[in-house]
Structures are given as structure tokens and as C-alpha cells.
Regions:
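Glycine/tyrosine- and acidic-biased, solvent-exposed loop/turn segments at the edges of beta-strands
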Residues: 1-110
């Protein structure tokens, strides 16, 4: 079953499947200004990049409906502000780097 695309007069496009935002081969929402949102089964989700890309350059990473990124900040605003999240939990940059270092060390040991 393929998602159904709805295009609005203002140029916005939305893909739905079973009443939920859903698209596996691209963003499920595309705004006329170029902003894009990736959804799977109604949840913000993207494994190979940010799940939200705003036209101004702001990027936000989500996985299974939770803010999440393991290799850097999960939110990078156009003004340079950054926020770190793992599994929906906000961390300071220092906390994030500590968790990342611990994971890297565990990977080396195994």
C-alpha cells in the first residue's frame, strides 16, 4: 500500500497512510519554502539525516518520535544554537560527550 499525497493550493504536500503522516522514500511533509519533515507511521523519524530540515537551515534529528542523535547535536538552529538529545532526553554538550566517549570505549573493548 502506498501513501496518499495531498497537495494544497499554497504548494504544501502531505503524504498519509492509514490516517497517519507516513512516507518511506522521502519527507512526508514538504512546505512550499523547502522545509521538509520525515515521518513513519505518524512519528517524526529519519535514520540517515535530520527528520526536520527548515528552509532557514535549521535541522532537527528524530528517531521513532523522539529527539535523538548519536553523532552530534540533535538540533542545530540556523543561528548556531545546538541541543543534544539521546532517546528524547536532553543532555548538555558535556554530558553528551561523556556518554559518547563511554560508548566508543565499550565498542573498542568488544
Amino acid at each position: 500500500m502506498k501513501p496518499k499525497m495531498i497537495t494544497y493550493a499554497d504548494g504544501m504536500k502531505y503524504w498519509y497512510m492509514n490516517g497517519k503522516l507516513h512516507r518511506e522514500d522521502g519527507p512526508a511533509i514538504e512546505w512550499a519554502d523547502g522545509t521538509k519533515f520525515w515521518y513513519l507511521n505518524g512519528k517524526l523519524h529519519r535514520e540517515d539525516g535530520p527528520a526536520v530540515e527548515y528552509a532557514d537551515g535549521t535541522k532537527r534529528w528524530w528517531l521513532n518520535g523522539k529527539r535523538h542523535r548519536e553523532d552530534g547535536p540533535a538540533a542545530e538552529w540556523a543561528d548556531g544554537t545546538k541541543f543534544w538529545y539521546l532517546n528524547g532526553k536532553e543532555l548538555t554538550e558535556k554530558e553528551f560527550n561523556k556518554v559518547r566517549l563511554k560508548k566508543n570505549l565499550q565498542d573498542l573493548i568488544q
